[in-house]
Amino acid sequence: MASQTAVSARSAYRQILRATRIAFQDDFRVLVAARQEARRQFDEHRREGIDTPMQINHAKEVATILRHNIVQGVRDSKDENAKWELRIHDDIERGDNDSIRVGGKKVKVDKPCSA
């Protein structure tokens, strides 16, 4: 039976893979690079150590940032004057200017971009 640490590490790794799929959808080159880096980091820290829980927590935070804060822009590569289109998906964190004024506090935004 696997240890709780191993289960947590696998869960964090799967979270990163899911987050990269969402964040880098339609950008195969970046998707592959992000997944290779995640694999490299997990392989590098394969042996359990004192800082393993911190590394697992870091991986979960990376997955959260990828899922909620990374927005990719695309434009027609043939037209230099083409406008950038942002690929904003349902998981992207949306805020308003009032949230900037709330220093040091967590702001929960529960409205879609179109509201």
Curated annotation (Swiss-Prot):
The annotated transit peptide is positioned at 1-36
Record's GO cellular component terms? mitochondrial matrix
Subcellular localization is given as: Mitochondrion matrix
Region described as Disordered: spans on this chain: 95-115
Q: Which GO terms describe its molecular function?
A: protein folding chaperone
Q: Say yes or no: keyword Transit peptide present.
A: yes
Report keywords, A-Z: Chaperone, Mitochondrion, Transit peptide
User: What is one Gene Ontology biological process annotated in the Swiss-Prot or TrEMBL record?
Assistant: mitochondrial respiratory chain complex III assembly
* Keyword Mitochondrion in annotation: yes
> How does this polypeptide assemble, per the annotation?
Interacts with RIP1.
Physiological role: Assembly factor required for Rieske Fe-S protein RIP1 incorporation into the cytochrome b-c1 (CIII) complex. Functions as a chaperone, binding to this subunit within the mitochondrial matrix and stabilizing it prior to its translocation and insertion into the late CIII dimeric intermediate within the mitochondrial inner membrane. Modulates the mitochondrial matrix zinc pool.
Which family is this sequence assigned to? Answer: Belongs to the complex I LYR family. MZM1 subfamily.
Q: What is this protein called?
A: Mitochondrial zinc maintenance protein 1, mitochondrial
The organism named in the record is: Neosartorya fischeri (strain ATCC 1020 / DSM 3700 / CBS 544.65 / FGSC A1164 / JCM 1740 / NRRL 181 / WB 181)
